[in-house]
Structure formats: C-alpha cells, structure tokens
Amino acid sequence: MSKDMSYSGVMSRRNEIMKNAIGIDYTTFESGSLSFDYEKMMRETGYTLEEMQKIQYSTGVGRTPVLELRNITALARKYAAPGKGARIFIKDEAGNPSGSFKARRAANAVYHAKKLGYKGVIAATSGNYGAAVASQAAMAGLKCIIVQECYDSKGVGQPEIIEKARKCEALGAEVVQLSVGPELFYKFLSLLEETGYFNASLYTPFGIAGVETLGYELAVEFREAYGKDPDVVVCSNAGGGNLTGTARGLIKAGAQSEVVAASVNLQGLHMASDTQFNKKSFTTSHTGFGMPFATWPDRSDVPRSAARPLRYMDRYVTVNQGEVFYITETLASLEGLEKGPAGNTALAAAFSLAQEMDKDQIIVVQETEYTGAGKHIQPQLAFARDNGIDIKFGNPKEEVAGINIILPENPGMIKAVDHEMNKLRKSLIKNALANYPDAKLDDSDIDFLVKETKSDTEFVKATIKEIKG
C-alpha cells in the first residue's frame, strides 16, 4: 500500500520521519507537563568538547583568528564620552572552509551521520548552513540535498539566497528551491522519508554543541593574548543556535562575559508573506526569526530545539538595515576586510555598545561570514531599489522596514536599540502555556521555565498568574 503523500498525510508522520532521520527519540527527554530535560538532550551528542574540537580540526574547521579592529575602535571613540570606547574585536569565522561559523555545526552533524551509516544528509536552510553541510558532506563522501525558501510567487529570488544556492551547488549539493510558504517543511519531510538521509538540522544537539567550540576558543584566545576574558560578546541572532552554542562554550571555559544578541530590525514585515518576502535586504540575523525563536524555540524542524537563546542572553539589541550596510562599508574601507551581512549585524551593534564601555574593556563580535555576488552591499541595495524601497542618507531611526533603507549621515548615528528582556521572558512563558494548554504545572515545570527565561521562581509564578488572570 502506497503512503499518503498529501500535505496532511506527510505531516501526520512527521515525528516518525524525524526519529528515523536523526536517530533521536525526543520523547525520552520529556519530563513534566511542558518541560523536558534539556541537558540530557544535549548530552545525547555523545561527544565531549575535546572530541568535537578533534572532529572539527580534522576538516579545517575552527581555530579561526581573532582580529582587533583598531581603526573602527578609534572611530567609535570619536563619538564616545571621555574615557569610553571599548576595544572592538572580531573572530574571523569566514576563515572556515565554507565561509562561516556554521561549518562548526555542520562538521559535527555530518560526522555523526556518517558514523551512524547514513548515505546522505539533508538540511532546510536559506544558505550559509547549507554551504557548510555541503562542504562537510563533500569531505565525508556523503550525498547532500539542501532545501531553500528562495522565491516569491512571481519567481523572483532574493539575491543573497540565490548566491548561497550557487555556493551549495558548487560544493556538490543538490539544491531544491521553493517559493515562500508552508511547502518548505512538507518538501523537507518528504525528501527525508524518500531518501532515508540524515536530518542535518540547524537545531539538533549535534549542531548546537558544535558551536560550543567557538565560545570556548574565544575565552582561551583572549586569556592567552590579553590576560582576560572578553567583557562583552555580541552574537548575531536569528534561530538562536549561534548565541546558544557560543554562550555554552564560554560557560564551559569558565568565562563570565556578558552575552548580547543582535538582530536587524524588520518589524512590520512578515517572514511568510509572499508580497513582503523581497521587501527585506537581510535573509538571516533579523527580528523575523530572532524574536519568534527566542520566545518559543520549539517551532523548528525538530520536536525540541537545542537552540534556546533566552537561557543565555543577557541583553537583546536591534540595529536597522541601513546601519548594517554602513558598518559593512566601514569595515572594508577602514580595516580592509570585506565580510557578509550576518556578522556585520553584530558589528553594527558592537560599534554602538563599545561607546558605552570603558576604554580598557573588550567587546567581541564572535563571527564573520564570507561575502560575494548576491550577499554584497551593491546587489542588495539594487534589489531593494527594484522592489520600490527608498534608499537615502539620513537618520536611521526613521527607517521603516519594507519602505526605506536609511544610511546614517555619520557613524555617530549608529545606535543599537535595547529590547525589554522581561517582555521577551513573559512572551516565552505565554507561548509555553499556549502550546501546552492542558499542562498541570508542577515544580519541574516551574524550574524549567526559570531556566528557559534566565529568571527566578518569583518572576515565573507572577507571570503565570498574570497570564491566567
């Protein structure tokens, strides 16, 4: 009897498909009414930090250089109060084989897939992770399929995503490109079931644990070179894996650094809207992913996401598109480094945050990514203009996503905007209760929500009372 391949038929088998494609039975981690044992799940990787480093180093991943941005630091100090202006550094993750930190996630996932005997790997991703999986699969001799949400209903593709497809194909992957909408997950599940390949998801314990090496390296490198841990580490934030993994690595190294999430402000644009899909100039590290995934991580392609950023986030800031474009050009013209938009989102935030800090403090942008073709400033701005976006110089705080892109008239106008952390924490608790409406909360559930929100019992109980009225 043939399987029901209708949308509802495939979706009804999603848990079975996922279990077969990852080799993890997520039900074993469930504990209370809505809680699960996160640390037990993370231990499911079966690899120690040292083993993960060995896996990554064997394929040329990791041990990327830390670079001090002396000229950008000097520029930030021109706009800072006397005695202010922290030293700004970047960890140049563009030096990984596929051109981004996501090689760390992919190295672990692909290694594990081969160890378990899978013949290939599949990932649903707009690009950088796809390139990383394709690169690692090529090294491991595994087949690779990347599923992308690329086009609107008119067949117009976002240049950054098209560029990433080019890179994936160049590295030997088969790329399945889809229009915006619910068919992405359906097609992804169908391919997993049809091929029997490993789900190299961004959100498995294998992938997130792979980023722990980045945070650990940061702490070790700064102690060796500067005799101290970074005071602040800024992470570009979308699905939360970058921040989660980096923070966990810092913790394993015993570092006390403040961890800041940074996203591009795309407020007002709906990520699943066909008409708004090409109104944005950033396909990752933006609030359209960052906010929803921070306040409810379990919305991904696995039953329980290993990326849980609110557990580790001390601060969440946003910057506008024009500010990131400006800092991207600044990095190239002042430091001789041409990098892509994701890491430069965090750099725009760091440029602003450094001005609040003392001169002897250190702020680090923990990733860079490669640039070129559709990822570059020029094609992105040209594409925006073709889609009716007004591009001008002015006050970036007047920028409205989907309407205009405002490049700052001077660097001093780059200002990161803080988001109220307690508001995010309350949103997560509200989403947890909404997703588990029949939950009879016990102490384990309360403790879980305390950890999920990096808060305390009093805050969680008060929020639940407020929500339930």
From Swiss-Prot:
Record bears the keyword Transferase: yes
Gene3D superfamilies: 3.40.50.1100
GO molecular function, one term: transferase activity
PTM-bearing positions, type N6-(pyridoxal phosphate)lysine: 102
EC numbers: 2.3.1.263
Record text on activity regulation: Completely inhibited by p-chloromercuribenzoate (p-ClHgBzO) and acetyl-CoA, and partially inhibited by N-ethylmaleimide.
Gene Ontology biological process terms from the UniProt entry: ornithine metabolic process
Cofactors required: pyridoxal 5'-phosphate
Catalytic reactions on record: D-alanine + acetyl-CoA = (2R)-2-amino-4-oxopentanoate + CoA
Binding site for pyridoxal 5'-phosphate: 128, 238-242
Keyword entries, A-Z: Pyridoxal phosphate, Transferase
InterPro entries in the record: AKP_thiolase_beta (IPR053471), Cys_Synth/Cystath_Beta-Synth (IPR050214), TrpB-like_PALP (IPR001926), TrpB-like_PALP_sf (IPR036052)
Pfam families xref list: PALP
Stored CDD domains: Trp-synth-beta_II
Record bears the keyword Transferase: yes
Subunit architecture: Heterodimer with OrtA.
Physiological role: Involved in the ornithine fermentation pathway. Catalyzes the thiolytic cleavage of 2-amino-4-ketopentanoate (AKP) with coenzyme A (CoA) to form acetyl-CoA and alanine. It is strictly specific for AKP.
Family note: Belongs to the threonine synthase family.
Database matches in PANTHER family: CYSTATHIONINE BETA-SYNTHASE (PTHR10314)
Protein name in UniProt: 2-amino-4-ketopentanoate thiolase beta subunit
Organism encoding this protein: Acetoanaerobium sticklandii (strain ATCC 12662 / DSM 519 / JCM 1433 / CCUG 9281 / NCIMB 10654 / HF)
